[in-house]
A protein has these predicted regions:
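Flexible linker/loop signature enriched in Pro/Ser/Thr and Pro/Gly
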Residues: 88-125
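Loop-centered beta-sheet repeat module
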Residues: 30-92
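Well-ordered beta-strand positions in beta-sheet-rich domains
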Residues: 64-66, 93-96, 144, 174-176
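Bulky hydrophobic/aromatic content
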Residues: 1-52
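Polybasic (Lys/Arg-rich)
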Residues: 122-220
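Short beta-strand-initiation
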Residues: 24, 60-62, 66-68, 140, ...
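A structural signal for short hydrophobic beta-strand segments in well-ordered beta-sheet cores
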Residues: 72, 102, 165-166
Length: 220
């Protein structure tokens, strides 16, 4: 049954989840994607009591999400929904295991080609996954890193062989890649100081400020 309802998951998971909520959500989303329909759901998050709670608005009412689903993806053992949140003109990613009370709507979904950053092209999932290695939702950009050469394999594993190398020395090399900005930022934070963002300047400046704040937080 799972296989018949998972044609929109990429890549297919090696280990299958035993979470009944996830199975149910996948089946509903698969059906909605096939029918090109919007869905409505509620979304849960952890609180300090270590239990899941539905996200709420400021007035205390439960927040409802109306989205157009395009694809599901597995990243680091977690299932993600790639979709368009109806209020906006871009892509959002949601954890499938945190979706609650999902239902398919009669309204037709928003075609991917009409979204900002789509280039009026159908969704290329391989490219999307390369650009969104941490499944963040933000604008894509051409990012240039300076890395230690020991990181080359990690860079290719993470971003694929579409990266460009330049300015190579015995110890360092520059890397240029078209990638999701938040993913680039997280990558640089994870591997600092072995990875340094060179361009774009706004991202370099933001990372420098964030790392400075992190350093100050550890000062006595």
């Amino acid at each position: 049954y799972f296989k018949s309802c998972s044609q929109y998951i990429y890549p297919l998971p090696v280990e299958r989840t035993d979470n009944k909520q996830v199975f149910y959500n996948i089946a509903i989303l698969d059906d909605a994607i096939r029918k090109k329909k919007k869905v409505l759901f509620e979304y849960a998050e952890y609180h300090t009591d270590k239990k899941m709670h539905l996200k709420k608005r400021e007035d205390g009412s439960v927040r409802e999400y109306i989205i157009t689903p395009y694809q599901m993806a597995v990243q680091e053992g977690k299932y993600y929904l790639i979709c368009n949140y109806d209020k906006y003109d871009d892509i959002s990613n949601y954890r499938v295991d945190r979706i609650r009370n999902i239902q398919i709507l009669e309204e037709k979904g928003k075609p991917f080609e009409t979204l900002k950053w789509s280039g009026h092209q159908p969704m290329n999932l391989n490219e999307y996954m390369k650009e969104h290695v941490y499944m963040y939702s933000s604008e894509n950009a051409f990012v240039k890193f300076r890395i230690v050469k020991a990181m080359i394999s990690d860079v290719i594993d993470l971003f694929g062989k579409g990266v460009n190398f330049s300015e190579e020395t015995d110890t360092h090399v520059s890397v240029s890649v078209h990638v999701n900005e938040r993913a680039a930022e997280q990558f640089a934070k994870n591997y600092a100081p072995d990875v340094v963002i060179l361009q774009p300047k706004r991202l370099r400046d933001k990372l420098r400020d964030d790392l400075k704040k992190a350093w100050e937080a550890y000062e006595d």
